[in-house]
């Protein structure tokens, strides 16, 4: 069972709530995904206050855990301010910490990320840092107090899947006891299954579901892929080989 900061969940699929065509389609997708955790962004525009209230009511009606994020923040100061606002609005110490370093690739800023993570952990937040796949950055985040890591598979919204499976596999081996979630870049269910087969604890999906022709059906497909990938990992799959290995034994075979 998936566990974050002492809370346990049956589903290993986390779902983002942005970019859906309508609130009802979002609700259908969340239900179809069987996800018990959704990420939400704090809306700061006062003109959208009523829309924000309706959205929050919808999320509460779904009965899922909420993971607020600091999407769009480019400095530690911005991220800290957003995190404090999110804690007040959503009533949770959880925060998905994003400090973006590049506007083209949306690659996280590792220096600002570690700085913000250290401050937030000291203030009692339970931090889920969106990071690259660098082991040293991961070490620094753990030292700062993070008990979950969320390395990217590929740039946000790119749908490219796992750009560097070797780095992700190495991270899994290096941190066997830290919950790891592939966050960003997943495009199709097979990408999610591949991440789970590497031993990752969960995946976070948003664009691949929200922008699909049928978001609810895609959410269900991802749920099945995540389950299949986890089962495959637990079943201890065979190692890839460069040469063939016969699957049919020669014992008992007639030689003519």
Curated annotation (Swiss-Prot):
EC annotation from Swiss-Prot or TrEMBL: 2.8.1.10
GO CC list: cytoplasm
Residue positions of the active site: 96
One GO BP annotation of this record: thiamine diphosphate biosynthetic process
Subcellular location as annotated: Cytoplasm
PANTHER family tied to this protein: THIAZOLE SYNTHASE
Protein's pathway: Cofactor biosynthesis; thiamine diphosphate biosynthesis
Top-level enzyme category: transferase
Protein name listed in UniProt: Thiazole synthase
Organism: Brucella ovis (strain ATCC 25840 / 63/290 / NCTC 10512)
Residues annotated for 1-deoxy-D-xylulose 5-phosphate binding in this entry: 157, 184-185, 206-207
């Amino acid at each position: 069972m998936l566990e974050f900061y002492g809370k346990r969940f049956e589903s290993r699929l986390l779902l983002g709530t942005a970019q859906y065509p309508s609130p009802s389609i979002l609700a259908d997708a969340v239900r179809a995904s069987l996800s018990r955790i959704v990420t939400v962004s704090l809306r700061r525009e006062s003109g959208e206050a009523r829309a924000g209230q309706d959205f929050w009511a919808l999320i509460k009606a779904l009965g899922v855990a909420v993971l607020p994020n600091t999407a769009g923040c480019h400095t530690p100061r911005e991220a800290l301010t957003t995190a404090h606002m999110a804690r007040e609005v959503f009533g949770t110490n959880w925060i998905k910490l994003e400090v973006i370093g590049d506007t083209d690739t949306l690659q996280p800023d590792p220096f600002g990320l570690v700085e913000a993570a250290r401050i937030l952990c000291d203030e009692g937040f339970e931090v889920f840092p969106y990071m690259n796949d660098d082991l040293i950055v991961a070490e620094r985040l753990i030292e700062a107090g993070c008990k979950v890591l969320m390395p990217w598979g590929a740039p946000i919204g790119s749908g490219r899947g796992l750009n560097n499976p070797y780095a992700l596999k190495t991270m899994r081996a290096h941190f066997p006891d830290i919950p790891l979630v592939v966050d960003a870049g997943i495009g199709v269910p097979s990408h999610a299954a591949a991440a789970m087969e590497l031993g990752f604890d969960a995946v976070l999906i948003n664009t691949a579901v929200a922008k699909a022709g049928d978001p609810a059906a895609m959410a269900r497909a991802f749920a099945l892929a995540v389950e299949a990938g986890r089962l495959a990992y637990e079943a201890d799959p065979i190692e890839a080989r460069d040469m063939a290995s016969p699957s049919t034994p020669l014992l008992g075979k007639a030689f003519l």
